[in-house]
């Protein structure tokens, strides 16, 4: 099936792995919420791959996409610049005065997941140290890697892409949100057969192995 005709809107955290799975489509990466808004406004996308399930489910409820399918999972991790100027060694250090915390905005999947983690850890007050609310996870990654923030929450898969520039601090399993990625074919697509074939490809062993190699978790 020829996939070069496809335009795929995908979560920023899929920037590296999707072209490795299939380099032929045209990809547009960004915050899942912003991409969904573009589809609602009539942008010519064939597929939406979101870093959560709620955004595509909302589009499905509105009749804009076919039934979303879960295709992978992820986890959150805290990153700090390699030099760690704020001397952050635990997530609990984020509540200290003067810490510059960079996060994604509410409504962006990783931003919502970040707030769940902080709440689960009893660290809602750390949000007082937020210096910027970004539009997607790659913006958080860049700010911390460049030393413009003392810490930020990203997906574990994103942290792997800037090894050597950041250090990571794990988050205990009990505080982790359920991070599931769902993909859906846009009903107005002019390439429905190719779009459905791409979704099928994501579920097959070769694509799943590439997702695992990039640090993503099995879909079930």
Regions found by a protein language model. Give the residues of each.
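Exported/periplasmic ABC-transporter solute-binding proteins
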Residues: 1-28, 33-44, 50-63, 67-220
